UniProtKB/Swiss-Prot annotation:
Pathway the protein contributes to: Amino-acid biosynthesis; L-histidine biosynthesis; L-histidine from 5-phospho-alpha-D-ribose 1-diphosphate: step 5/9
Name of the protein: Imidazole glycerol phosphate synthase subunit HisH
Species the sequence originates in: Listeria welshimeri serovar 6b (strain ATCC 35897 / DSM 20650 / CCUG 15529 / CIP 8149 / NCTC 11857 / SLCC 5334 / V8)
Positions in coiled-coil regions: none
Domain Glutamine amidotransferase type-1: 1-206
SUPFAM superfamilies per record: Class I glutamine amidotransferase-like
UniProt-annotated location(s): Cytoplasm
Gene3D superfamilies named in the record: 3.40.50.880
Length: 208
Protein backbone atom coordinates (compact mmCIF):
# COMPACT_ATOMS: atom_id res chain seq x y z
CA UNK A 1 0.00 0.00 0.00
CA UNK A 2 1.25 3.46 -0.96
CA UNK A 3 0.02 6.51 0.92
CA UNK A 4 -0.23 9.79 -0.97
CA UNK A 5 0.17 12.44 1.69
CA UNK A 6 -2.78 14.80 1.93
CA UNK A 7 -1.92 18.23 3.33
CA UNK A 8 -4.16 20.36 1.11
CA UNK A 9 -1.22 21.22 -1.15
CA UNK A 10 -1.05 18.88 -4.10
CA UNK A 11 -2.56 17.00 -6.98
CA UNK A 12 -3.39 13.91 -4.95
CA UNK A 13 -6.27 12.60 -7.06
CA UNK A 14 -4.38 12.56 -10.36
CA UNK A 15 -1.48 10.72 -8.72
CA UNK A 16 -3.92 8.22 -7.21
CA UNK A 17 -5.50 7.59 -10.63
CA UNK A 18 -2.08 6.98 -12.18
CA UNK A 19 -1.23 4.47 -9.45
CA UNK A 20 -4.60 2.77 -9.95
CA UNK A 21 -3.80 2.48 -13.66
CA UNK A 22 -0.59 0.53 -12.99
CA UNK A 23 -2.30 -1.63 -10.37
CA UNK A 24 -0.62 -0.14 -7.33
CA UNK A 25 -2.87 -0.04 -4.28
CA UNK A 26 -2.92 3.43 -2.77
CA UNK A 27 -4.67 5.71 -0.34
CA UNK A 28 -4.80 9.49 0.09
CA UNK A 29 -4.31 10.22 3.78
CA UNK A 30 -2.95 12.61 6.39
CA UNK A 31 -3.30 10.04 9.18
CA UNK A 32 0.09 9.47 10.77
CA UNK A 33 -0.60 5.83 11.64
CA UNK A 34 -1.64 5.02 8.07
CA UNK A 35 1.41 6.82 6.70
CA UNK A 36 3.79 4.92 9.00
CA UNK A 37 2.16 1.61 8.07
CA UNK A 38 2.53 2.27 4.32
CA UNK A 39 5.05 0.39 2.19
CA UNK A 40 5.94 3.66 0.48
CA UNK A 41 4.91 7.30 0.47
CA UNK A 42 4.36 9.93 -2.22
CA UNK A 43 4.63 13.59 -1.23
CA UNK A 44 2.88 15.76 -3.84
CA UNK A 45 2.88 19.53 -3.89
CA UNK A 46 1.87 22.63 -5.79
CA UNK A 47 2.10 26.27 -4.72
CA UNK A 48 4.63 28.07 -2.54
CA UNK A 49 7.34 26.38 -0.49
CA UNK A 50 6.93 28.33 2.79
CA UNK A 51 3.18 27.69 3.03
CA UNK A 52 3.55 24.02 2.10
CA UNK A 53 6.28 23.44 4.67
CA UNK A 54 4.27 25.32 7.30
CA UNK A 55 1.29 23.06 6.62
CA UNK A 56 3.39 19.90 6.96
CA UNK A 57 4.72 21.17 10.29
CA UNK A 58 1.25 22.20 11.50
CA UNK A 59 0.00 18.67 10.91
CA UNK A 60 3.13 17.05 12.35
CA UNK A 61 3.78 15.40 8.99
CA UNK A 62 7.36 16.69 8.81
CA UNK A 63 8.20 14.45 11.75
CA UNK A 64 6.24 11.55 10.24
CA UNK A 65 8.14 11.83 6.94
CA UNK A 66 11.46 11.79 8.77
CA UNK A 67 10.31 8.69 10.64
CA UNK A 68 9.44 7.05 7.31
CA UNK A 69 12.96 7.85 6.10
CA UNK A 70 14.51 6.30 9.24
CA UNK A 71 12.38 3.19 8.68
CA UNK A 72 13.96 3.01 5.19
CA UNK A 73 10.61 3.04 3.44
CA UNK A 74 10.65 4.62 -0.04
CA UNK A 75 9.55 8.23 -0.48
CA UNK A 76 8.81 9.96 -3.80
CA UNK A 77 8.42 13.74 -3.84
CA UNK A 78 6.63 15.23 -6.85
CA UNK A 79 7.10 18.84 -8.07
CA UNK A 80 7.01 21.04 -4.94
CA UNK A 81 7.02 17.80 -2.96
CA UNK A 82 10.48 17.08 -4.37
CA UNK A 83 11.74 20.51 -3.30
CA UNK A 84 10.40 19.96 0.22
CA UNK A 85 12.74 16.96 0.51
CA UNK A 86 15.68 19.37 0.26
CA UNK A 87 17.38 21.23 3.10
CA UNK A 88 15.90 24.64 2.35
CA UNK A 89 14.41 27.10 -0.14
CA UNK A 90 14.77 30.83 -0.75
CA UNK A 91 11.27 31.17 -2.25
CA UNK A 92 9.96 34.50 -0.83
CA UNK A 93 11.76 33.88 2.49
CA UNK A 94 14.38 31.41 3.67
CA UNK A 95 12.57 28.24 4.74
CA UNK A 96 14.03 25.03 6.10
CA UNK A 97 12.89 21.86 4.37
CA UNK A 98 12.82 18.22 5.41
CA UNK A 99 16.55 17.78 4.83
CA UNK A 100 16.24 14.28 3.36
CA UNK A 101 18.24 15.10 0.22
CA UNK A 102 21.18 17.56 0.24
CA UNK A 103 20.54 20.79 -1.66
CA UNK A 104 18.24 23.78 -1.75
CA UNK A 105 15.53 25.20 -4.00
CA UNK A 106 16.23 28.46 -5.81
CA UNK A 107 14.51 30.43 -8.56
CA UNK A 108 15.23 29.66 -12.19
CA UNK A 109 17.43 32.37 -13.77
CA UNK A 110 15.37 35.08 -15.43
CA UNK A 111 16.64 35.19 -19.02
CA UNK A 112 14.84 36.63 -22.08
CA UNK A 113 14.74 33.36 -24.02
CA UNK A 114 13.34 31.34 -21.13
CA UNK A 115 9.87 31.93 -19.73
CA UNK A 116 9.23 31.53 -16.00
CA UNK A 117 7.47 29.43 -14.92
CA UNK A 118 9.02 26.61 -16.90
CA UNK A 119 5.82 25.03 -18.16
CA UNK A 120 5.30 22.23 -20.65
CA UNK A 121 7.15 19.26 -22.08
CA UNK A 122 10.92 18.93 -21.81
CA UNK A 123 13.35 16.14 -22.55
CA UNK A 124 15.12 14.11 -19.87
CA UNK A 125 18.76 13.05 -19.92
CA UNK A 126 19.58 10.09 -17.72
CA UNK A 127 22.50 10.71 -15.36
CA UNK A 128 22.36 7.50 -13.35
CA UNK A 129 20.48 4.26 -13.83
CA UNK A 130 17.95 3.57 -11.08
CA UNK A 131 14.65 1.68 -11.13
CA UNK A 132 12.92 5.02 -11.80
CA UNK A 133 15.28 6.28 -14.51
CA UNK A 134 16.13 3.14 -16.50
CA UNK A 135 13.74 4.10 -19.34
CA UNK A 136 13.75 7.91 -19.19
CA UNK A 137 16.69 8.89 -21.41
CA UNK A 138 15.46 11.04 -24.29
CA UNK A 139 11.83 10.94 -23.13
CA UNK A 140 9.66 14.02 -22.63
CA UNK A 141 7.95 14.82 -19.33
CA UNK A 142 5.63 17.60 -18.17
CA UNK A 143 6.94 20.43 -15.97
CA UNK A 144 5.28 23.34 -14.16
CA UNK A 145 7.69 25.17 -11.83
CA UNK A 146 9.60 28.39 -11.17
CA UNK A 147 12.14 27.02 -8.67
CA UNK A 148 14.59 24.16 -9.09
CA UNK A 149 16.74 21.92 -6.93
CA UNK A 150 20.35 23.04 -6.60
CA UNK A 151 21.91 19.74 -5.55
CA UNK A 152 25.37 18.18 -5.46
CA UNK A 153 25.77 16.21 -8.72
CA UNK A 154 25.92 12.83 -7.01
CA UNK A 155 22.24 13.17 -6.05
CA UNK A 156 21.03 14.11 -9.55
CA UNK A 157 19.78 11.14 -11.59
CA UNK A 158 18.14 12.89 -14.57
CA UNK A 159 18.19 16.42 -15.97
CA UNK A 160 16.45 18.68 -18.47
CA UNK A 161 17.92 21.69 -20.25
CA UNK A 162 16.51 25.18 -19.71
CA UNK A 163 18.06 28.46 -18.52
CA UNK A 164 20.06 26.13 -16.28
CA UNK A 165 20.44 22.37 -16.26
CA UNK A 166 17.38 21.39 -14.23
CA UNK A 167 17.61 18.35 -11.97
CA UNK A 168 14.51 16.57 -13.23
CA UNK A 169 14.99 13.70 -10.80
CA UNK A 170 17.05 13.38 -7.63
CA UNK A 171 17.82 10.48 -5.31
CA UNK A 172 19.32 9.74 -1.92
CA UNK A 173 19.12 6.03 -1.10
CA UNK A 174 15.45 5.04 -0.90
CA UNK A 175 14.28 8.66 -1.30
CA UNK A 176 13.46 10.01 -4.76
CA UNK A 177 12.19 13.26 -6.21
CA UNK A 178 10.70 14.25 -9.57
CA UNK A 179 10.50 17.96 -10.42
CA UNK A 180 8.06 17.20 -13.23
CA UNK A 181 4.67 15.50 -12.91
CA UNK A 182 4.90 11.75 -13.65
CA UNK A 183 1.11 11.49 -13.42
CA UNK A 184 0.79 14.01 -16.30
CA UNK A 185 3.66 12.65 -18.41
CA UNK A 186 1.96 9.86 -20.32
CA UNK A 187 3.49 6.42 -20.67
CA UNK A 188 6.96 7.39 -19.46
CA UNK A 189 5.40 8.85 -16.31
CA UNK A 190 3.71 5.52 -15.67
CA UNK A 191 7.05 3.74 -16.22
CA UNK A 192 8.63 5.98 -13.58
CA UNK A 193 5.85 5.11 -11.13
CA UNK A 194 6.39 1.43 -11.94
CA UNK A 195 10.04 1.99 -11.05
CA UNK A 196 8.97 3.36 -7.68
CA UNK A 197 6.86 0.23 -7.25
CA UNK A 198 10.03 -1.79 -7.88
CA UNK A 199 11.91 0.19 -5.22
CA UNK A 200 9.10 -0.47 -2.73
CA UNK A 201 9.20 -4.19 -3.46
CA UNK A 202 12.98 -4.28 -3.03
CA UNK A 203 12.94 -2.31 0.23
CA UNK A 204 10.12 -4.43 1.60
CA UNK A 205 12.07 -7.62 0.88
CA UNK A 206 15.24 -6.29 2.51
CA UNK A 207 13.33 -5.33 5.68
CA UNK A 208 11.72 -8.74 6.15
Amino acid sequence: MIVIIDYDTGNTKSISKALDFIGLQNKISSNKTEILQADGVILPGVGAYPEAMQELIRRGLDVTLKEIAVLRKPILGVCLGMQLLLESSNEHVFTRGLGLIPGYAEKLPDEPKFVIPHMGWNQLENKRITPLTKKVDGEYVYYVHSYYANCPPEYIIATSGYSVEIPGMINNGHIYGAQFHPEKSGQIGLEILKGFKEVIRSCKSSLQ
